[in-house]
Amino acid sequence: MGSAEGSKLAINKMLIFQVIGIIALLSIPSLLYTGSYIISEAPAPKEGIEQAPSSEERLSEGLLFIVLDGGRKDMMRDSNFMPNLNSMVDENGTFIDVLTGPLTMTASCVKEMATGIPSRPKEGLSNFHPEHPGTPDGWTLASSYDGDGDGIADNEFAIVGDYVWGDLYADNDEINFMKHRHGHSDYMKGDIESFETLNSWFDGEIPKSNTKEDVTFERLPNVIVAHLSGLDSTGHRYGTTDSPEYEEKLRWLDEKFTEVFAKVPENWTVVLTADHGLTESGQHGSSDAVIREVGAWAWGPHIKKSHTVEQIDQRDLATLPSLLLSLPLPHATHGKFPLDALDISDEEKQELNQWNWNATVMRNQWMEDNGHNYVEGLSSEVIEWEKISPEKMGL
């Protein structure tokens, strides 16, 4: 090799390294942003609530919120598998299409339904033991809010079933958590125990807490979250479509719920949903449509009959305690009321929509004040939901 060729090769190598160096430098901001996004939580105000328009007039006197872990929408909606559940909404209630976030892990889905705050990738690292962000949410307020000032919370909140919800609110001794989950191969035992606890409550009995032995709960709950995970375990083991085991589990759940539903007071609202769906082989975690698209079956006072609501975001379900029980609406909740499900006057809908929007405007203001992404020009005078998107709200 001549000296000229050697010099040319050296120059080419130098140019290559320079290009690589420039690309690396240009990538640093993106890598820092992406890394921060992955390991951090979505920004949300740790305080701030919007009072209900009328705390004395509530849409419901109680709320039974049921989550079937790993419930496929198409199979749950099939009356061959869950005839009793579907008859409740086909005749007396509303079916709602629900879209989960892209991270379809149990903890991330539960956290969105509970807090209304969108999940970040870090939630996947703590799939079975989510951490509460420390923000106000409707379920926390259901356990503690004393609107009439008599020194006693207006509602009594209890959780039964899987430990995911219990772990999320582990630091709240006002919540009676009855844990009924015995590992990932628990196809039946935990669900059987959960139904026993549910029936006890509706029969007027209060079993001793099996997670807070030093706390005595004397009031029957009128706000209940029941998270049953046996269906998810069954799907993981046996698959879903064309799986006799998964199909039989759906039928068993449908029969057990029929007994419970008959005991729910008429002035309560019942909402049954799934945290995520499952693929044919029983998997979840990805953003496949069959996993993200779940359903919600709802009935009770002021709920439309024989009605279907177009798709809502899963975190919209976090607004239900505030909406139905006239609890304050936290500014931190990234949720929109599913008003189309309600059988109320247009004037009442407008009032509730304004309440919801006011909380959104306050959250947007907090985003701006604290250096996060926000939407310019929002005001309480003009309701502009179309301007709100995850990309523009600091997610």
Can you annotate each of these PLM segments?
Residues 2-59, 135-138, 162-170, 247, ...:
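Membrane-interface soluble catalytic domains
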Residues 5, 11-19, 51-59, 188-216, ...:
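A long, amphipathic alpha-helix that forms part
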Residues 24-29, 39, 43-48, 55-65, ...:
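Active-site-proximal alpha/beta segments of enzymes that process anionic O-linked groups
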Residues 65-67, 223-227, 271:
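Structural motif
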Residues 69, 88, 113, 226, ...:
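Structural scaffold positions in well-ordered secondary structure
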Residues 71-72, 229-231, 276-278, 302:
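Catalytic metal-binding/acid-base residues of hydrolase active sites
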Residues 218-232, 292:
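Short coil-to-beta-strand
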